[in-house]
Amino acid sequence: MLYALICTDKPGSLAARKANRPRHLAYLKSLGETLVLAGPFTESDGQTMNGSLIVVEAASIDAARKIATNDPFARLGIFASVDIRPWLWTMNNPGKEA
């Protein structure tokens, strides 16, 4: 099943996010095919990152939670919150027709 990890940064954490982004990206890359898609949320300027959307394939919500908990941004306290929700990829899914 797919799970969307909707991660919101703590206010004032942009410097820590930028400094630790290589670790975060390396962690996401290490997930291999478990990672479906990922990218940062931004402020209205389209540049200033303030959170992340990460979609993973996991056997259960507990497995998705473990992935979220092990993210360096979570371990370093950059995320204020992580909402984990089951997700159905309906449109533009390269693996299935709608």
Locate predicted features.
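Conserved, structured core segments of small domains
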Residues: M1-A98
